[in-house]
Amino acid sequence: MVSSTTSEVQPTMGVKIFSAGVSACLADIITFPLDTAKVRLQIQGEGQASSTIRYKGVLGTITTLAKTEGLPKLYSGLPAGIQRQISFASLRIGLYDTVQEYFSSGRETPASLGSKISAGLMTGGVAVFIGQPTEVVKVRMQAQSHLHGIKPRYTGTYNAYRVIATTESLSTLWKGTTPNLMRNVIINCTELVTYDLMKGALVNHHILADDVPCHLLSALVAGFCTTLLASPVDVVKTRFINSLPGQYPSVPSCAMTMYTKEGPAAFFKGFAPSFLRLGSWNVIMFVCFEQLKKELMKSRQTVDCTT
């Protein structure tokens, strides 16, 4: 990503969007059980989510879910997760370079920190509004329990879209847009800008070449910084999206209820699976993204040479 440090032909916007979407979907498939564990830990202690089963730690949560609800439960909501990455990650990551160039007006080499942050803000914000319905369905599918005696709210992904729209309202599919917007603005800026800066520093100071080890290390650093900053907003977003109608009058009310009933530590519930998930997700996505861009451009150049 993001600022090229080589003389290779630059990927087109279409190549970047396609590469981002494919890489994000692959990363989501591999790391989805960690995301499900994160959601369960985040809603633990909430009124409607309380049960006799307590989740402890990342592996403990995954093991408990597999034993009590079956292995498929770890991937409940995956179709919505894939839809989310297609509509969300492909735009926020794929358009980042193009928007960054727009803000720098092509005059800054390399682009300034302000241009990078502005690009992250814009692409993250636009992507949230487009992909929010998939986020709502994904979280609710991950949060609902299939334990004996508890009737699931939804029988499947598409049933969830229909039930939410008909029994609550169409606007409910955009429930939690405010905290999700805050979360993803933080994530997009921190993730992309940190990765961009880290990669640039490693390459420009000749510590690592612009290749897989550089991409891997940059992605890990970006994942940790992003998780640390986004965790409080992420927990509030998950609680608010998963809440029953009228449970929380507003996002601030949800945050205040968490603080008064569970204390400040509640805002960092699920931090370990969040970092494991986001760190591993970043590594898979960014490494695949970089390599896929290169291979697609090589293929395009080969086709151009033969025609």
Curated annotation (Swiss-Prot):
Residues 33-73, 134-178, 233-266 are mitochondrial matrix. The chain crosses the membrane at residues 11-32, 74-96, 117-133, 179-195, 213-232, 267-289. InterPro entries: Mit_carrier, Mito_Metabolite_Transporter, Mitochondrial_sb/sol_carrier, Mt_carrier_dom_sf. Signal peptide: none annotated. It is found in: Mitochondrion inner membrane. Brown adipose tissue. Has no constitutive proton transporter activity and has to be activated by long-chain fatty acids/LCFAs. Inhibited by purine nucleotides. Both purine nucleotides and LCFAs bind the cytosolic side of the transporter and directly compete to activate or inhibit it. Activated by noradrenaline and reactive oxygen species. Despite lacking canonical translational encoding for selenocysteine, a small pool of the protein has been observed to selectively incorporate selenocysteine at 'Cys-254'. Keywords: Ion channel, Ion transport, Membrane, Mitochondrion, Mitochondrion inner membrane, Oxidation, Repeat, Transmembrane, Transmembrane helix, Transport. Changing T31A: No effect on GTP-binding. No effect on fatty acid-induced proton transport. Loss of fatty acid-induced proton transport. Gene3D superfamilies: Mitochondrial carrier domain. GO terms for molecular function: cardiolipin binding; GDP binding; GTP binding; long-chain fatty acid binding; oxidative phosphorylation uncoupler activity; proton transmembrane transporter activity; purine ribonucleotide binding; transmembrane transporter activity. Solcar repeats lie at residues 11-102, 111-201, 210-295. GO terms for biological process: adaptive thermogenesis; brown fat cell differentiation; cellular response to cold; cellular response to dehydroepiandrosterone; cellular response to fatty acid; cellular response to hormone stimulus; cellular response to reactive oxygen species; diet induced thermogenesis. The keyword Nucleotidyltransferase does not apply. Most probably functions as a monomer. Binds one purine nucleotide per monomer. However, has also been suggested to function as a homodimer or a homotetramer. Tightly associates with cardiolipin in the mitochondrion inner membrane; may stabilize and regulate its activity. Belongs to the mitochondrial carrier (TC 2.A.29) family. This is Mitochondrial brown fat uncoupling protein 1. It comes from Rattus norvegicus (Rat). The gene is Ucp1.
